[in-house]
């Protein structure tokens, strides 16, 4: 065998890994400071392949342990009051997402021919509901429960590439951060994008002006949702030509988007009234307006979302649409006291650190719920603001009043008719 190794000593013509010289092997590849023979290349290739297969088997075992829809729903219910249909929808969607991943890994491990030609597509979810109805809380609770990468982003910060704001790839960046830049885990994660209605087109008509936070962002997000290889800057921020990028395949990432879609009910109402001109308007008079708004949203069709300002291709990528209803007074009362981290429990813990017991009469809880319902734009989010206003003076004065042992809040305190009842030591 003539390998043309003129100018090299006998010692330098040996494999750096096994020590065989160039006469004992078929091929010896020489680099700047090391050499490797064809035997070692074949050996190392087998090692890497085995590691990959073992990793797939481990991933499959991890996916086998994934919680059932009942488990997911039960956990959501410990933190989120009401919205039973939405919780069930999310539980099934997340479970099916991981069944889909498990099926893919199972085929790689077992080379099974059963349903081998059947491709399981993603079922991305669109959540529609008023502010304070629990969309973000549901996403945050899911993120805590699932041992998988789960990130939450805000659509209002996203702009087209080249404009002030965040690139759409930042939603993938946040997912990478959640799993310490483990690309394999990120590629099977879940992304929740809040305020998705804020990137609706300003008008159905084509405009000559640039809509940098509307249709352009929808087009850019569409590519990620459909499945593409995204090039992500390693430390976030804008892309620069000289920097290296992390490549993330978004094909298996599940996307959940949420928004209030204010005014969507009117679009649905117009469509239905056009189709049922006689009798429909009469029913408006007979129904409670808030109940009607919720029932209208339950009849939402893709064409309504398109008229609202979402592009058809974007709407088409969300086969699951789930509606969150406005919270009733009884549900707001339950939110105050029942969840694991209920607001009342949080403030009781704060007072407990000052060795003071905080109690709320049932009448006070109902009064707080009534106040929250009066501010229709905030929903459950208004509960904390109301509690802060009620308890502010107490939280300010109590650290200097060592003898106070208990504070009682009733409905008169909530409505500003009296001050909290204080109980003292001895």
From Swiss-Prot:
Keywords: ATP-binding, Chaperone, Metal-binding, Nucleotide-binding, Zinc. InterPro entries: AAA+_ATPase (IPR003593), ATP-dep_Clp_protease_ClpX (IPR050052), ATPase_AAA_core (IPR003959), Clp_ATPase_C (IPR019489), Clp_protease_ATP-bd_su_ClpX (IPR004487), ClpX_bact (IPR046425), P-loop_NTPase (IPR027417), Znf_CppX_C4 (IPR010603). One of its GO terms (molecular function) is ATP-dependent protein folding chaperone. SUPFAM superfamilies: Glucocorticoid receptor-like (DNA-binding domain), P-loop containing nucleoside triphosphate hydrolases. The keyword 4Fe-4S does not apply. GO terms for cellular component: HslUV protease complex. It comes from the Bacteria. Zn(2+) binds at residues 15, 18, 37, 40. Component of the ClpX-ClpP complex. Forms a hexameric ring that, in the presence of ATP, binds to fourteen ClpP subunits assembled into a disk-like structure with a central cavity, resembling the structure of eukaryotic proteasomes. Belongs to the ClpX chaperone family. NCBIfam families: clpX, PRK05342.1. This is ATP-dependent Clp protease ATP-binding subunit ClpX. The lineage of its organism: Bacteria, Pseudomonadati, Pseudomonadota, Gammaproteobacteria, Enterobacterales. The gene is clpX.
């Amino acid at each position: 065998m003539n390998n043309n190794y003129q100018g090299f000593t006998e010692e330098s013509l040996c494999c750096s890994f096994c020590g065989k010289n160039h006469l004992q092997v078929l091929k010896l590849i020489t680099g700047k400071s090391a050499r490797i023979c064809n035997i070692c290349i074949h050996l190392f290739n087998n090692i890497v392949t085995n590691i990959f297969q073992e990793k797939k088997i481990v991933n499959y075992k991890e996916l086998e342990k994934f919680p059932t829809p009942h488990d997911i729903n039960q956990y959501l219910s410990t933190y989120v009051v009401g919205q039973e249909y939405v919780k069930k929808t999310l539980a099934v969607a997340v479970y099916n997402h991981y069944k889909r991943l498990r099926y893919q890994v199972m085929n790689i491990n077992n080379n099974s021919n059963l349903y081998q030609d059947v491709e399981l597509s993603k079922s991305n979810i669109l959540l529609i509901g008023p502010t304070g109805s629990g969309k973000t809380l549901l996403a945050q609770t899911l993120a805590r429960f699932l041992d998988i990468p789960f990130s939450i982003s805000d659509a209002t910060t996203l702009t087209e590439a080249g404009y002030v704001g965040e690139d759409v790839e930042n939603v993938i960046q946040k997912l990478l951060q959640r799993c310490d830049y483990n690309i394999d885990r990120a590629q099977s994660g879940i992304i929740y994008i809040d305020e998705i209605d804020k990137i609706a087109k300003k008008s159905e008509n084509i405009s000559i002006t640039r809509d940098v936070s509307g249709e352009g962002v929808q087009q850019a997000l569409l590519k990620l949702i459909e499945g593409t290889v995204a090039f992500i800057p390693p430390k976030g921020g804008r892309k620069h030509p000289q920097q290296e990028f992390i490549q993330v395949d978004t094909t298996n990432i599940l996307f959940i988007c949420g928004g209030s879609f204010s005014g969507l009910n009117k679009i649905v109402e117009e469509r239905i009234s056009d189709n049922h001109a006689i009798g429909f308007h009469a029913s408006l008079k007979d129904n409670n307006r808030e109940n009607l708004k919720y029932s209208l949203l339950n009849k939402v069709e893709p064409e309504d979302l398109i008229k609202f300002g979402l592009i058809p291709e974007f709407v088409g990528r969300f086969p699951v649409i789930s509606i969150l209803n406005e919270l009733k007074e009884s549900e707001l009362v339950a939110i105050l006291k029942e969840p694991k981290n209920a607001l009342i429990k949080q403030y009781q813990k704060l007072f407990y650190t000052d060795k003071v017991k905080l109690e709320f009469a049932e009448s006070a809880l109902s009064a707080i719920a009534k106040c929250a319902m009066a501010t229709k734009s905030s929903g459950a989010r208004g509960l904390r603001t109301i509690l802060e206003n009620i308890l502010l003076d107490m939280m300010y004065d109590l650290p200097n009043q060592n003898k106070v042992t208990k504070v009682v809040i009733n409905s008169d305190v909530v409505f500003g008719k009296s001050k909290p009842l204080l109980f003292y030591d001895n």
